[in-house]
A protein has these predicted regions:
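Noncatalytic, basic helical substrate-engagement surface that gates or grips nucleic-acid strands
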Residues: 1-140, 144, 148-164, 170, ...
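Non-catalytic nucleic-acid-binding/docking modules located in mid-to-C-terminal regions
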Residues: 46-51, 109, 151-153, 166-305
Length: 305
């Protein structure tokens, strides 16, 4: 199981009231919600391996260089070149992130981030490796761009309606919902646009036309090539719109697609048989008022051991 950590702790932060606090008054709603989500996922899906994937860089320079609008609306403060920009995050969430990562570590659950890359890239790399090895993989995220990693062995558990109502996206489910092969979802998103990521899309091409174009012609590179050669299979209307957006289409696929070629450190991602640091886990429970959530996590892990 590969989880998109930021996607989940943002959902936890907004889903659990900030009246949930530690004894010292610090809000711990995101920590509690995140921990409870993981316990629920482990209990329901019973993974034998688990990695919490991290955004070491939420807006990587290589993507911004290709498409400056990428996530630009979420920048709180630009930083010197070579350092990640500061993301606009709720003030009450920021101090909770180290706590939830400490809970993972003390429980013995693996986490992984790669400098210069997003969690999506870590997930895409680990999912591709596991798929090639013949392993079944569940990816947990509220980011639909990760539909692009779905295969016969890799399933996306989409959290858009919450953990209690996960949407299980397989190749057949993606085809039924969007009318496209799952590997072409990033191309579909490039054409349609995605304001949440700063993708403008191609003017005049909406979801229906994007679905038709991708299902008929394949990835963006093929669509652009057909438009440039004047292939009669493509309607003049679509050709005109594609050619008008040629500069955008030449770079956007590399922005949206998750990287599958990251160099990642070896890690023990097996579900732990016992707490890695039981004293620390107990201390976190006392300090932050998380004893009940930590006990649920322990119970979930023990049920698999």
């Amino acid at each position: 199981m590969l989880i998109d950590s930021a996607s989940m702790y943002f959902r936890a932060f907004y889903g659990v009231p900030d009246s949930v606090t530690a004894p010292n008054g610090m809000p711990v709603n995101a920590v509690r919600g995140f921990t409870d989500m993981i316990a629920t996922l482990i209990t329901r899906y019973r993974p034998d391996r688990f990695v919490a994937c991290l955004d070491n860089d939420w807006r990587p320079a290589f993507r911004v260089e290709l498409l400056p609008s990428y996530k630009a609306h979420r920048v709180l403060r630009a930083t010197p070149q070579g350092q990640p920009d500061v993301e606009e995050i709720p003030d009450l969430l920021t101090p909770q992130v180290p706590v939830l990562l400490a809970v993972l570590k003390a429980a013995g659950l693996a986490s992984l981030g790669v400098d210069g890359f997003e969690a999506d890239d870590v997930i895409a790399t680990l999912a591709a490796r596991a798929d090639a090895a013949g392993d079944q993989v569940d990816v947990v995220s509220g980011d639909r761009d990760l539909i692009g990693v779905v295969t016969d062995r890799v399933r996306l558990l989409y959290t858009g309606r919450g953990i209690a109502k996960l949407e299980e996206l397989t190749p057949d489910a993606v085809q039924a919902k969007y009318g496209i092969p799952c590997q072409y979802y990033p191309d579909f998103a490039v054409l349609r646009g995605d304001p949440s990521d700063g993708l403008p899309g191609v003017p005049g091409i909406g979801e229906k036309t994007a679905s038709i174009a991708v299902s008929k012609f394949g990835p963006i590179e093929d669509i652009l090539a057909l438009a440039q050669t004047g292939d009669p299979a493509m309607s003049p209307t679509i050709r005109t719109k594609v050619l008008a957006a040629a500069d955008y289409l030449a770079v956007a696929p590399a922005v949206v697609r998750g990287r599958t070629d990251l160099t990642v450190a070896d890690l023990d991602d097996s579900l732990p048989r016992s707490d890695a640091d039981p004293e620390m886990l107990d201390a976190l429970g006392r300090e932050f008022g998380l004893a009940s959530s930590i006990e649920r996590l322990r119970t979930a892990i023990a049920s698999i051991a």
